[in-house]
Curated annotation (Swiss-Prot):
Cofactor: Ca(2+); heme b
Catalytic activity, EC: 1.11.1.7
Record protein name field: Peroxidase 1
Biological process (GO), any one: hydrogen peroxide catabolic process
GO molecular function ontology, one term from the record: metal ion binding
S-adenosyl-L-methionine keyword on record: no
Family to which this protein belongs: Belongs to the peroxidase family. Classical plant (class III) peroxidase subfamily.
Note describing how the cofactor binds: Binds 2 calcium ions per subunit.
Task performed by this protein: Removal of H(2)O(2), oxidation of toxic reductants, biosynthesis and degradation of lignin, suberization, auxin catabolism, response to environmental stresses such as wounding, pathogen attack and oxidative stress. These functions might be dependent on each isozyme/isoform in each plant tissue.
Catalysed conversion reaction: 2 a phenolic donor + H2O2 = 2 a phenolic radical donor + 2 H2O
The species this protein was found in: Daucus carota
Keywords: Calcium, Heme, Hydrogen peroxide, Iron, Metal-binding, Oxidoreductase, Peroxidase
Source organism phylogeny: Eukaryota, Viridiplantae, Streptophyta, Embryophyta, Tracheophyta
Top enzyme class: oxidoreductase
């Protein structure tokens, strides 16, 4: 998966 996208989503989720 895209680490950048995943990280962004993860941050947004939190």
């Amino acid at each position: 998966w895209n680490e950048t996208s995943d990280k962004d989503l993860y941050t947004d989720s939190r």
